[in-house]
Swiss-Prot record:
Protein name: Large ribosomal subunit protein uL24
HAMAP family named among the record's database cross-references: Ribosomal_uL24_B
CDD domains, A to Z: KOW_RPL26
Keyword Disulfide bond: no
Keywords recorded for this protein, A-Z: Ribonucleoprotein, Ribosomal protein, RNA-binding, rRNA-binding
Gene: rplX
Organism listed in the record: Chlorobium phaeovibrioides (strain DSM 265 / 1930)
Pfam families found in the cross-reference section: KOW (PF00467), ribosomal_L24 (PF17136)
GO biological process per UniProt: translation
InterPro entries: KOW, Rib_uL2_dom2, Ribosomal_uL24, Ribosomal_uL24_CS, Ribosomal_uL24_KOW, Translation_prot_SH3-like_sf
Family recorded in the similarity comment: Belongs to the universal ribosomal protein uL24 family.
Known function: One of two assembly initiator proteins, it binds directly to the 5'-end of the 23S rRNA, where it nucleates assembly of the 50S subunit.
The UniProt record lists the keyword Lipid metabolism: no
Length: 80
């Protein structure tokens, strides 16, 4: 029985310039901010932006809605 998690080979690295080749953001390009080799996903600057609702805290008592990049699958991006 094997233990541990298998990492997938991801063809891009942090700070590479990539272009999205499929999905809602097809044709957009940006810099890779982070790579998740275990899940085979990457976060690309300015791509797959979603709204995230943040709870109220002492620093922001009303809470807030922030927009941030979410991961896309590595097979949906190409270098260049």
């Amino acid at each position: 029985m094997k233990t541990g998690v298998k990492k997938l080979k991801v063809h891009v690295k942090k700070n590479d310039m990539v272009t999205v080749i499929s999905g809602n953001d097809k044709g957009k390009s940006g810099k890779v901010l982070r790579v998740y080799p275990v899940k085979g996903r990457v976060i690309v600057e300015g791509v797959n932006i979603r709204k995230r609702h943040m709870r109220p805290t002492q620093s922001s008592p009303q809470g807030q809605i922030i927009e941030r990049e979410f991961p896309v699958h590595a097979s949906n991006v190409k270098k260049g």
